[in-house]
């Protein structure tokens, strides 16, 4: 009896066409990443072994991933990992998936301080710990705290903390914004945050990938600025003199967040950091000394 043979090349071609029919943005790349995950090989391996037949067990693990991807689940949530700042983080469908935009925030802080600076960092709305752990990885004498209201996110953050062996320099706590710090008298050199900032009215234009991520990690109220208002008011209480704040913002929110910081009257040196496309995606400031 004839048994159909699926090679690496053939399955990738089929998957690309299938994802194209679903109008997915990166059909070829998605298929390659999912197959690499199943085979536990890098993507280069796929091209150097194009004619390699796949085992039935490999096909059985690959097909459900393709189906779930077509339903709108992100590749990262399906593979359980996401690369960020040259590091590989654990993720799942209960956390915000790290995006390249956020690297602009991390790179700004890394360029502001030296490796030997023993700074203390607070990461508000830490999610899977991506920002804080990246900073601690590249600033080997820094320490930090990550706060988040989501227990599911903190579970993944702790997993990443252990993977990078940063237990001695980082801590994660469940907290509704600054509530944890109300009982802990501590000041920080830096407060970073990538808070929820999508406007509620923009929900209808979001891709299925994004809508499958946790609601509480995405939306920042009617105008998207709800969390920035609280950050602007509260950060001054927990920063050392001339301490730094650095917030990721939506593509059109930089001026609005700047205005919020100005209205508080406690910040100086308010400025922007742009992404590779020249869009201001980070707002930074210093608290008055």
Language-model regions, residue ranges each:
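Conserved Class I SAM-dependent methyltransferase catalytic core
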Residues: 222-286
